[in-house]
Structure formats: C-alpha cells, structure tokens
From Swiss-Prot:
Record GO biological process: DNA replication
Protein name according to UniProt: Master replication protein
Ranges spanned by the short sequence motif RCR-2, renumbered to the chain: 41-43
Cofactor note: Divalent metal cations, possibly Mg(2+) or Mn(2+).
PROSITE patterns: CRESS_DNA_REP
InterPro entries assigned: CRESS_DNA_REP, Helicase_SF3_ssDNA/RNA_vir
Note in the entry: The genome of nanoviruses is composed of six to eight segments. In addition, some isolates contain subviral DNAs.
Catalytic activity annotation: ATP + H2O = ADP + phosphate + H(+)
CRESS-DNA virus Rep endonuclease domain location: 2-96
Organism (species): Milk vetch dwarf virus (isolate N)
Coiled-coil boundaries: none
Residues the record lists as binding a divalent metal cation: E33, H41, D84
Role description: Essential for the replication of all genomic viral ssDNA (trans-replication). The closed circular ssDNA genome is first converted to a superhelical dsDNA. Rep binds a specific hairpin at the genome origin of replication. Introduces an endonucleolytic nick within the conserved sequence 5'-A[GT]TATTAC-3' in the intergenic region of the genome, thereby initiating the rolling circle replication (RCR). Following cleavage, binds covalently to the 5'-phosphate of DNA as a tyrosyl ester. The cleavage gives rise to a free 3'-OH that serves as a primer for the cellular DNA polymerase.
Active site: Y79 (for dna cleavage activity)
C-alpha cells in the first residue's frame, strides 16, 4: 500500500498498554474488543493531520494492522465503537469533525456549492480523489463553462439575422462563411451566443485529430479563426465535419457519424481559392 492517506482503520492484537493521541494525529478513537475466536485486540480509527504512508503509521503504533479507510468517515468511526464485540471503551481523543461524505456524488454536490477545486478534496475525501480525480476536474470544467456561458450577452447586428434565417433552412451540404475584414463586427460574440443557445461546438482550429476527438456529435459546428490563423486553416476538417463523418484517431481510433451537421466559419478573411466548391459556400458579410 504505497499511497499516503489521511484516514486509517487499524487492529492491534494482544495490546499491552493504552493508546494516546500522537501530535501527528487529528483524531483517534478505539476500543478493546474480543473477536469470535477469542482474541483480544484494539479496534480503532485515526484521522491524521497530513497524508501519511503505511510505514509511517506502523511507526506510530508498532504491531498494528492498518488499512486505509474505504467507507465514509461516520462508518469508520461507528465500526471502531460497535457494541457487540466491545470489552472496554471506546476512548476518543482529539475532535471528530464530520465532513462531507467521501463519495463522488457528495463531492460533486459540494463543488457546486463551494466552488472548490478538486485538489482541495485530497485530504478530507481522499478515497474519492484517489479514484476520481480526472472526473472531478472534468466536472469542475463543466461548472466553469456553465458559469461563463450564463454571463455571455449579445449586442445584435443586422448580419446576425441573416445567419439566423439560414439556420432555419437546415442545409447540411453548405458552409456558412461569415466574413468581417475589419474586426469588431461581433463575430465571436455571436459564436458565443450560438454556443449558449444551441449547444454549438466551438473551435479556433487545429489538428484534425484534436478537433475530431473534441467534437461530440453537435449538429452546429463553429470555427472562429483569429486573423493570424489565415495561413493555417485546416480546410480538410471543415469539409469532413460538413459531411457528417470524421475519423478520430486520438487515444482510440473511432469514426464519428452524424446525419446532419451545419458548419459556420467566422473569419477576417475569405477561404483560399479552390478549397471548397462554389456551390457549397454561402457568404454572410458582417
């Protein structure tokens, strides 16, 4: 057991002297018990001030068998105080401070309320963090995304009405290219509006593998190219998404399909000549 944790359950067979709260411990509870086979032992639960290794715990209570806590904080404490096998005790030292349950759903709910980062649960919910750190980071990202999206506001421009009208037609064979050479026409603000109101997929471009991996079958795909990206536009990935079929080779090779995809490009430049058939491009001038 190489991992360092805060919360430990222990059994000490044939104890010779009582235990006390070590300066490294935050909380200790134990009692003297007799097992089914008649062996006398201490059964206890410890919460350390800092994450501690198994070797470190064995130095504090030599001869004890330790396991990291697997259930909740309350369950571990209750097990160390159970009546059916008790001979003496229980004895408690330090302060028992109930925290949120060390379960993924409870931690996620707490993150919603407190806004804590996943790393902040590494001590009080060590089991959940050890098992689900990546899930917690992804969940926090979604919380941040929702908070940001709610704050987005749109100052409408006439050209946006033209795009709205085009989107009502549902034509997945075309690419809508919103062209505004000066900048400041509201292209990015409108792209954010579509993310907020239509759950659109948003990208500023990049490698096909990265974009294909990130795309989660959204029907509306937005490419919002900065001016400096003109020479690096990945026209191939735009075409593939427009066709509703794209191969994602990142981490695990998979082909993604969709029966309808609408692609909108926002740029300060027009597409390079010959990249798309003329009948596939619909220009909107911002």
């Amino acid at each position: 057991m190489a991992r360092q944790v805060i919360c430990w359950c222990f059994t000490l067979n044939n104890p010779l002297s009582p235990l006390s709260l070590h300066e490294l411990m935050k909380y200790l509870v134990y009692q003297r018990e007799q097992g089914e086979a008649g062996n006398i032992h201490f059964q206890g639960y410890i919460e350390m001030k800092k994450r501690t290794s198994l070797a470190g715990m064995k130095k504090l209570i030599p001869g004890a068998h330790f396991e990291k806590r697997r259930g909740t904080q309350g369950e571990a404490r209750a097990y160390a105080m159970k009546e059916d096998t008790r001979l003496e005790g229980p004895w408690e030292y330090g302060e028992f401070i109930p925290t949120i349950e060390d379960k993924l759903r409870e931690v996620m709910n707490d993150m919603k309320i407190t806004g804590k980062r996943p790393i902040e649960y590494i001590e009080e919910c060590c089991n959940t963090y050890d098992k689900s750190a990546s899930t917690l980071r992804e969940f926090r990202g979604e919380l941040k995304k929702k908070k940001a999206i709610i704050s987005w506001e749109l100052q409408r421009k006439p050209w946006m009405d033209e795009v709205d009208t085009l989107l009502q037609e549902r034509d997945g064979r075309r690419i809508i290219w919103v062209y505004g050479p000066q900048g400041g026409e509201g292209k990015t603000s409108y792209a954010k509006h579509l993310v907020k109101t239509r759950d659109a997929f948003y990208s500023t471009g990049g490698k096909t593998a990265d974009i294909a991996f990130a795309w989660d079958h959204q029907e509306l795909v937005l490419f919002d190219f900065p001016r400096s990206f003109e020479e690096y536009v990945n026209y191939g990935v735009i075409e593939q998404l427009k066709n509703g079929i794209i191969q994602s080779g990142k981490y695990q090779s998979v082909i993604k399909y969709s029966d309808y995809v609408e692609v909108i490009v926002f740029a300060n430049f027009t597409p390079r000549s010959g990249m798309f058939s003329d009948d596939r491009i619909v220009y909107v001038y911002a």
